[in-house]
Amino acid sequence: VGSEMCIRDSKVSVYPIEEKTSFVVKDTRYTLDSLIRNRKIARHFQGGYAVILRLTVDDYHRYCYFDDGIKSENHRINGVYHTVNPIANDHVKIYKENTREYTLMKTKHFGDALQMEVGALMVGKIVNHDGAGSMRRGIEKGYFQFGGSTIILLLEKDKVEIREELLERTKNQCETKIRQGEMIGKALV
């Protein structure tokens, strides 16, 4: 069970990370460099996977660690809060970025990973409980205050085998609804 990656209730998309990979989070297109604002970290995850977990109002807004290991301090990237309402975005075309926090992790089963929380309007508050130190699978890492938000996991090359159907559905621009405890992928040992 420890070698299976299980996250939380959400709508999931999984992208192979290549040089030009980009994806949309909260109506903003990001490359790995623009998402993390750290080219060295972005390069470290080349060839791996970006797992995007979109939470909606019907999802539980607390999130847990997906494996045991050691974590860094939380790194905050300030953004400008804007609504994710498509009607508002159609009338006011402006550059926007959401506030993000990420944690670097050395996991027991999945190698190096990065977990990022992304907040939006009315969900601007990301609350992470702990600083650097140990982490345990299934223990709450933090929560979003009010409404829907997004969690992004970056995983190293050759460390995890993602369920093929998730990759296929993402390729066809479809999210997959998953539940807490449902397997996303397995560690490659």
Question: Can you say where each PLM-predicted feature lies in the sequence?
Answer:
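Short, well-structured beta-strand-loop connectors
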Residues: Y65, G69-E73, A132-F144, C174-L188
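Short, small-residue-biased leader/transition segments that mark boundaries at the very start
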Residues: G2-I7
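Cytosolic, membrane-proximal regulatory domains of ion/volume homeostasis and mechanosensation machinery
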Residues: S22-A50, L55-Y60, F66, N74-I126
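Acidic, glycine-rich catalytic/binding loops that coordinate metals and/or anionic ligands
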Residues: L104, K159-V189
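Short, compositionally biased
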Residues: T28-Y30, P86-H91, I151-E164
